[in-house]
From Swiss-Prot:
GO biological process: light-independent chlorophyll biosynthetic process; photosynthesis
E.C. no: 1.14.13.81
Enzyme category, top tier: oxidoreductase
Protein name in the entry: Magnesium-protoporphyrin IX monomethyl ester [oxidative] cyclase 1
Cofactors named for this entry: Fe cation
InterPro entries in alphabetical order: AcsF (IPR008434), Ferritin-like_SF (IPR009078), Rr_diiron-bd_dom (IPR003251)
Tree of life domain: Bacteria
Species of the source: Thermosynechococcus vestitus (strain NIES-2133 / IAM M-273 / BP-1)
Gene: acsF1
Assigned protein family: Belongs to the AcsF family.
Entry GO MF terms: iron ion binding; magnesium-protoporphyrin IX monomethyl ester (oxidative) cyclase activity
Catalytic activity: Mg-protoporphyrin IX 13-monomethyl ester + 3 NADPH + 3 O2 + 2 H(+) = 3,8-divinyl protochlorophyllide a + 3 NADP(+) + 5 H2O
Pathway of action: Porphyrin-containing compound metabolism; chlorophyll biosynthesis (light-independent)
Length: 380
């Protein structure tokens, strides 16, 4: 008698090559930006710290870390059913996010090479790290008889345009929250090795230090641009920066960057990153259960640590202890579960509309929770 392992069905581009997950508001995004503005960025105010970070990047502490050992050389058919599906999704999302970082950093290094060589080399070395991470994750997917065609992703994924300032806010938070996600899982599994279902988790301690160093780089760049943080433009600086063209794109940038206080953007990106992670992880709570983690407790710890870390550079942080903070996020979790059920039943947009509007309302109310002044202490 032959045992058939319960394996989830995934759409494939061709045998063994998984079709990319459908793009939604919660999936990892690919970014592009104003490369000319990046090249013209003045970093003299914090150049010494950036040069020190560049020296760290050059050391390449993890050059020999991402090497698969004999523990990978086995069948993984015992990871089956829902756990297998969720783990493959975890690997895919992680690989896509790392590859997105590689593409952005590589393009920035190429565009800035002759104009801003210090930043260009930093971006080049960060792209090296991101490529290494993405490749390691894609090889892990292959252990489950699937992998991503990263060239296909490059050509067919839609790219989201962000102003340079927004790139720095978003990537800083992405790297720092990545650090806290990886180190929290690693520390948990060190205490509970019986839940280490796959050897990739053994690599998370050193891996997360790449994320931490990348976050420190973006921290240093923002400190070199204090108008992004706690030194908003003066009225006369705003007048001087009025666009001398009728370009709608330039005028949109002018109003968003010059007239919206940086504290509001910091709050917006903190909330966006935290809400996205919370909604994604609660959709996949069974994956964290397989690791011996409670998804809610895990996310709340990661959010608290990332929020505290962000306070080292951002002028404000979120009040994640406010009683409404998680109440409203939970309402969004409930709404998303209902949206998933409607989609399974091929329900139309009108059925989904009240839930979409409810999610928007919850986000508005979350944004309006008064922010907190950060305590400037290092987080370990």
């Amino acid at each position: 008698m032959v045992n058939t392992v319960a394996k989830p069905e995934f759409e494939e581009l061709r045998p063994g090559i998984k079709a990319p997950a459908k793009e939604t508001i919660l999936t990892p995004r690919f970014y592009t930006t104003d490369f000319e503005a990046m090249a013209n960025m003045d970093i003299t105010e914090n150049k010494a710290e950036l040069e020190a970070i560049l020296e760290e990047f050059r050391c390449d502490y993890n050059r020999h870390h991402f090497v698969r050992d004999e523990e990978f050389e086995q069948s993984w058919d015992h990871i089956d059913g829902e756990t297998r599906r969720l783990f493959i999704e975890f690997l895919e999302r992680s690989c896509t996010a790392e590859f997105s970082g590689f593409l952005l950093y590589k393009e920035l290094s190429r565009r800035l090479k002759d104009r801003n060589p210090l930043l260009a080399e930093c971006f080049a070395l960060m792209s090296r790290d991101e490529a290494r991470h993405a490749g390691f994750l894609n090889k892990a997917m292959a252990d489950f008889n699937l992998s991503l065609d990263l060239g296909f992703l490059t050509q067919h994924r839609s790219y989201t345009y962000f102003e340079p300032e927004f790139i720095f806010y978003a990537t800083y938070l992405s790297e720092k929250i990545g650090y806290w996600r990886y180190i929290t899982i690693y520390r948990h599994l060190e205490k509970h090795p019986e839940h280490r279902i796959y050897p990739i988790f053994r690599f998370f301690e050193n891996w997360c230090q790449d994320e931490n160093r990348h976050g420190d780089f973006f921290d240093a760049v923002m400190r070199a641009q204090p108008q992004m943080l706690d030194r908003p433009r003066t009225f006369w600086q705003k007048i001087k920066e009025i666009p001398l063209s009728l370009s709608g794109k330039k005028w949109a940038r002018y109003f968003m960057v010059c007239w919206v206080p940086p504290k509001l953007w910091c709050r917006f990106f903190l909330l966006s990153v935290f809400a996205t992670m919370y909604l994604n992880d609660l959709q996949r709570a069974k994956f964290y259960t397989a690791l011996g983690l409670d998804a809610r407790e895990y996310d709340r710890e990661v959010i608290a640590k990332t929020n505290e870390t962000a306070g080292r550079v951002f002028p404000v942080i979120l009040d994640v202890d406010h009683p409404e903070f998680y109440q409203r996020l939970e309402r969004c979790v409930e709404n998303n579960a209902k949206l998933t059920e409607i989609a399974k039943q091929n329900g139309g947009f009108l059925k989904k509309l009240p839930l979409y509007l409810s999610n928007v309302w919850q986000m508005i109310k979350l944004f309006l929770i008064p922010a907190k002044e950060p305590t400037r202490v290092a987080v370990r």
